[in-house]
Every structure is written in structure tokens, then in C-alpha cells.
């Protein structure tokens, strides 16, 4: 028992593990692996990232100078995703195909999809994984950056306030 009501538990499960969309009209899809683990542990943890973030994806993002802040607000045409996997140079289709980004909206007039993180688990886990590649390697410094991330981004929803910590 975690001290939450049934309704509060459902809301927390939704915030942490819901939100995947594979097409514009799809229903919200929960991450089943994370749901099973959260119910078993009776805690809201980041289970999806236990396998780690693929190195090739991080390298692709670094090559294209894709900023973490950009991942909260991506507009893309469908054509952007119609590229053979072996010749892909754009990290956005890879992020979508691997579940780091999901469809949040569609502008029919412009013919563009709005992509963002599907839920809190992915947003937090991916950002913390990226910190390892964009920050000093000292454990204490990394912990300070993770703290700044959680305080500024997760609690206050202010990515701009967090960014100076990465450049320090």
C-alpha cells in the first residue's frame, strides 16, 4: 500500500506510464512492462530504462546537434519517417520508432505531426541517460545535475532553468 487512493494511483500510473500513440487516432497505450513492475513493486519507478539508452542514438543526436530541449516540441512531416533504417541520419524517426517520442497531435492543414515524450518515465529516464554524455563524469557532479534536472524540469516544468547546469 502506497498511501494513495485508487483514483490517485490511476492518475500516477497514467502520468508515469501512459501516452504512447502510434497513429494520430490511436488510443493511449500504457507501457505494459512498466505497469507490471510498478504494480509488483508498489512504486512508481523508471523501469523502461533498465536496459539503457542505445549509444548509436546518443551519437546520432550529438552529430546532428539535437538539443534535449528540442525533444519536448517537435513538428515533423510524415515523409520524415519514410527512410530506410540502414541509411537513417535523422534521430527523430529513430526516437519515434524506439518509443522515446510519440504522436501528441496532428495539424491537418499543415500536414505535420506534433511529437513529444509519451510520459514522465520516458522524459525523466531519457534525460537522465543523456546527462551521462553531456556532463562531467564525476559522480558527485552528475548527482548535482540530476538533482537540478528533477527540481527544475520535473517539479517546476522549466527546462530553460536546467540548461545552464549542462553547460557549466
Q: What annotation goes with each model-predicted range?
A:
Residues 1-37:
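Amphipathic alpha-helical segments of the small helical/lid subdomains adjacent to P-loop NTPase cores
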